[in-house]
Regions:
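Alpha-helix initiation/capping motif
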Residues: 1, 27-31, 167
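Single conserved hydrophobic/aromatic residue that forms the stacking wall/gate
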Residues: 1-12
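Catalytic PLP-binding core of fold-type I/II PLP enzymes
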Residues: 6, 43, 78
Length: 212
């Protein structure tokens, strides 16, 4: 296929691509982050299993316990906090406040975060988890959020904190170099009017921070 021909290797092939903003969509779910959409799907799946009367054979899971993760993902995806997104985040923050997930507590401790709200999730907790993926250690976030071991949680939290500092340093270096390139270009071409957009590149710039 096209991805193979372009040397991209194995790429997950989706069966379909659906624009969530289609005019005929009446689900009112088009503003959900992927984590919220996944949660809605799981709720529907549980309902279907209940309809098939399978829960007498297996324990019906309580899904509310996962709303802390839904809230975290929703805030970090920077979607509009209205409707179902707002409800997810409110319920999730209430759960986080009860200190039930060791991984989140580890990050709260390492980042000196006492109060918890949208700002703390978006600027203290989330960036430390995301730093792992941006610096090539994406499994750390999963391990942290699923671990019940205090020692493992603190070890991973410290590593994520260090990776976040590393990410910030890399980001500042890239920004500094990009700014210098732009300034040199303006001087060289004697531009009096700034163009609408400027594209710069660097061979050694870390791909993990270019989207920030």
């Amino acid at each position: 296929d096209s991805s193979t021909s372009r040397g991209l290797g194995d790429v997950y092939k989706r069966q379909s691509h659906i624009n969530p903003s289609r005019e005929e969509d009446s689900s009112h779910l088009n503003d959900l982050a992927a984590v919220g959409l996944t949660f809605v799907f799981i709720v529907g799946l549980r309902r279907a299993i209940r309809t098939l009367n399978l829960f007498p054979e297996i324990t019906e899971p309580s899904l509310k316990q996962y709303l802390d993760l839904v809230a975290l993902g929703t805030v970090c995806d920077v979607v509009q906090l209205k409707g179902l997104n707002r409800a997810f985040v409110k319920e999730g923050i209430d759960i986080i406040a009860k200190r039930q997930r060791p991984g989140i507590e580890g990050l709260r401790s390492i980042s000196n975060t006492s109060d918890i709200g949208v700002t703390e999730l978006g600027f203290r907790i989330g960036p430390r988890i995301n730093a792992a993926g941006r610096t090539g250690a994406s499994d750390l976030g999963y391990r942290l959020l699923t671990s019940q071991s205090e020692d493992e949680v603190m070890a991973i939290s410290e590593r994520l904190n260090n990776l976040n500092q590393q990410r910030q340093n890399i980001e500042q270096t890239v920004l500094f170099e990009a700014t210098n390139i732009v300034e040199d270009e303006i001087i060289e071409k004697k531009l009096n009017i700034m163009p609408n957009s400027i594209v710069v590149s660097g061979e050694k710039w870390h791909l993990g921070v270019l989207g920030i």
